[in-house]
Amino acid sequence: MFLQCLSTASAKNSLDLNDLPAFAEKYLRIQDKQMRTVALRLNSIQRRFLRERTGRDVVLKARQVGISTVEQARMFWRARTGSVSTMTLGKDEENKTRLRLMWQGFRDNLPPELQVKPKYDNAGLITHSDTGSYQVMNVAGPNG
């Protein structure tokens, strides 16, 4: 259902479903530093990361440049446009919750015609009943 609605919307707006930056700007919303809900417009570092990532990347000390945001957006986009299993590890419970709320914000701020109620939606698991995708959220380390 989501893909059918998205394909219809894409055809009307000439939006390439393989183009994460365009998808993000059109459909994904985040909270900015002033706590306003705004469109996700990828910055130059985020775009470069998407272009050059290998799939085996480890990002060290990349704070405040948007890597967590672009990775959550990429996983959400992949979960909504195909069938994938993704995992997010937060450094602690607070970080995991913040990342989970970002994912929830992506979903809750989609246009109504693109929203799909998840089969499961709790602190550790979000499923997408229409694509079969799921997102596992946990805490890294011995307490996770």
What is the predicted role of each segment?
Residues 2-144:
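Phosphate/NTP-binding elements of NTP-utilizing enzymes
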